Amino acid sequence: MERNYPKIQITDKAARSLRSGHPWVYADEVLQADAACVDGQIVDVTTRSGHWLGAGFYNSASKIRVRVLSRNANDRFDEAFWARRIRYAVDYRRTVMGQDFDNCRLIFGEADGFPGLTVDRFGPILVAQVLSLGMELRKQQLFALLLQTLHADGAQIDAIYERNDVKLRQKEGLEQGTGFVTLDGLRTDLNGHVTIRENGILYDVDYIHGQKTGFFLDQKYNRRAAAQLAQGKHVLDCFTHTGAFGLNCAAAGAASVLSVDVSEDALTTARHNAALNGLQDRVEYLCADVFDLLTKLAEQKRGEYDYIILDPPAFTKSSATVANAIRGYKEINLKAMRILPRGGYLATCSCSHFMTDDRFRAMLADAARDAQVSLRQIEARQQGPDHPILWNVPETDYLKFYLFQIV
């Protein structure tokens, strides 16, 4: 097939990275770019000697200069190409999610071959984030193809809402914004709330004002795993956000649940979710700084909780702040270990890619040593399979979740 795309030549180091399967070319890895390269459009990527490596989206305004789409020289980036990719992504979710297909991540960026595009499904609502220029220029086409695919499978989709209110867009030269997508058959007059069921628990998802796309689907099966230990336990659910871990534990028969968050708005949503499930009398809510609360409980050594869940926000979003993040993670885990009695249980996690599993495990080992306890590992888990991990793209591997008994 004759190729008419502009070319960029990259360094030997970048070529090795692409050959290993990583899809990004950084600005300082570009040796030469044709004058015909246009931001947001397809370019061919070659070695310094001209050997073809792949094709992807070019953006001179981004530190990620090229996001590789394909290493198949026969690919034509037409509607049929995108329709195939969408079909693969949807079929994969139908296979791995089964009955949970109604509420899952349908498209997970690079892991599905859509660099910079995320789409979550909450029943009849799709919520999208577009974080690359290449996807921005094609989003209407992709949304239409996704709708066609879902409708062909019998799924009812009422609306698509864009949550492009993220600073990452600025790194691509894109403005922030939100709003309903206008396409034939879609509504644009909804109130921004949808009720979903996950693990048997009902949640009110605020996809207009909630964090990220409105609800963290990646912890779906970790919540279920955590709930399996909860029967008869006195649970301290830290960083509860919309209350999901605590509600799963209450529904599983916990003796008591105290769910804590520093945000009163989050707790208002959590209380509403408890009421949706008839669990309002089974869960208490406390607006407090978790660091301060754990410090107080560790000093008291009262041992009133025998199960602590730590689901903090990402303490680091760059390699530059990893050291500070490790200190933060260690502080909350160390205090939790000191609060728990021997035989108590700890669920702990990190949602930062930069806090690698090796770093997280080392931090937990340090905390256990300082607390003079041993950790009996029950499970080591990760994000759900609707957030697939590509081994050659470490950025797709971000969520660590551990269940321990303190011995």
Role assignments for model-derived ranges:
Residues 305-335:
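Mobile active-site "lid"/loop adjacent to the S-adenosyl-L-methionine
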Residues 265-309:
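S-adenosyl-L-methionine
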Residues 232-241:
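Conserved class I S-adenosyl-L-methionine
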Residues 304, 331, 345-407:
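C-terminal catalytic and target-recognition region of SAM-dependent MTase-like enzymes
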Residues 228, 242-255:
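Conserved SAM-binding loop of SAM-dependent methyltransferases across substrates and taxa
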